[in-house]
Each structure stands twice: as C-alpha cells, then as structure tokens.
C-alpha cells in the first residue's frame, strides 16, 4: 500500500508525532507502516533475532540501541529473517551493516548509520517497553509510518484508504 508521510502530516498533524530527521532508509522497501513492537538493547542482537522469529504481519520492529553506531544491530541475515516472517519494517536507533544485501531484501529498514562491525549475539535487553528517541516516546502497540521523507508516530491506526487510489 502506498503511503506518503508528508500527506499524512497534512491530514493528521494534530494526532501524530513526527520523529526528528535523523534516520536514513536502507532496506529494499522505501515505505512501510504497522503496529510497533519495541526492543531496548545495547550492541547485542540475540533478543532481536528471537523477536524476528515471530509472525510480523502488520508489525514494525522498533529497536532502541541507545543511538550507538559502534556495532550493527541488523545485518542481512536478520533482515531476511524479518522479511521471511512477514515483518513490515525495522527502525533501528543504532547501526546496521551489509548495505548491498539489505537493498535486495523486501523489507523497510531505517537506521542511523551503517558500520561493518557486527554485534554480540547475547539476548540481553527488554521487549515491549516504552522507548524514547528522535524527540518522541514510542509505546508498544503504537503505529508508525515511514517513507523516504520521514517517520511519524500515532497512538491509533491512521485511515489510509484515500491512498489506495493513488
């Protein structure tokens, strides 16, 4: 489905929060949206792998990596796992790696930056907790909408029917 965050802001500005423009798009899909599942972890991705094993249909994984860019939290293997399990997208407040491969995987990915160094594979962190970055607080089960222009957050799903005809 087509979405345009600029148009959504024009229509729903009083109902949404706009994430600061600190993210770049890296995945094979430039637009994505869904109900968020949150993870808070630092320089390790074991918990991320566990969550991505779940059915992700209609869901976006939102990872608070503390803004650290020394180790990548998402790589091609995890992105492919997410795509295979139907996840709509991944937003990483941290780093990712293997950009050439990520471009060819059918999933939306937004992150701060790429780096070639991988993360630890320990399952340390928290899931389904509120996280704060980019000037907004994300709560589990909020809805996020992302495209090349930006990321917006809503407590309720937005009506996207008018975009179906575009």
UniProtKB/Swiss-Prot annotation:
InterPro entries named among the record's database cross-references:
RraA, RraA/RraA-like, RraA/RraA-like_sf, RraA_gpbac
Give the Gene Ontology MF terms in alphabetical order: endoribonuclease inhibitor activity; enzyme binding
User: According to its UniProt record, where is this protein located?
Assistant: Cytoplasm
Q: Which Gene3D superfamilies match?
A: Ribonuclease E inhibitor RraA/RraA-like
Q: Which GO terms describe its cellular component?
A: cytoplasm
Membrane: present as a keyword of the record? no
What the entry lists under Pfam families is as follows: RraA-like
Presence of keyword Manganese? no
| BP terms from Gene Ontology | regulation of RNA metabolic process
Keyword terms: Cytoplasm
CDD domains per UniProt: RraA_family
Listed NCBIfam families: NOT-MenG, PRK09372.1, RraA_entero
Subunit field text? Homotrimer. Binds to both RNA-binding sites in the C-terminal region of Rne and to RhlB.
**Any idea what job this protein has?**
Globally modulates RNA abundance by binding to RNase E (Rne) and regulating its endonucleolytic activity. Can modulate Rne action in a substrate-dependent manner by altering the composition of the degradosome. Modulates RNA-binding and helicase activities of the degradosome.
The record's similarity note reads: Belongs to the RraA family.
What name goes with this protein?
Regulator of ribonuclease activity A
- Which organism does this sequence originate in? Histophilus somni (strain 129Pt) (Haemophilus somnus)
Its taxonomic placement starts with:
Bacteria, Pseudomonadati, Pseudomonadota, Gammaproteobacteria, Pasteurellales
């Amino acid at each position: 489905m087509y979405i345009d965050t600029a148009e959504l802001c024009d229509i729903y500005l009083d109902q949404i929060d706009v994430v600061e423009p600190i993210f770049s798009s890296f995945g094979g899909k430039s637009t994505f949206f869904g109900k968020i599942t949150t993870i808070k972890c630092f320089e390790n991705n074991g918990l991320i792998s566990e969550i991505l094993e779940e059915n992700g249909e209609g869901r976006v994984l939102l990872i608070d990596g503390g803004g650290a860019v020394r180790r990548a939290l998402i790589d091609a293997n995890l992105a492919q796992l997410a795509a295979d399990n139907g996840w709509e997208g991944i937003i990483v407040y941290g780093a990712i790696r293997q950009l050439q491969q990520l471009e060819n995987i059918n999933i939306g990915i937004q992150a701060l930056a790429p780096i070639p160094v991988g993360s630890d594979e320990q399952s340390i962190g928290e899931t389904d907790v509120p996280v704060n970055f980019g000037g907004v607080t994300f709560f589990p089960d909020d809805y996020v909408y992302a495209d090349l222009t930006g990321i917006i957050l809503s407590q309720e799903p937005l009506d996207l029917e008018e975009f179906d005809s575009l």
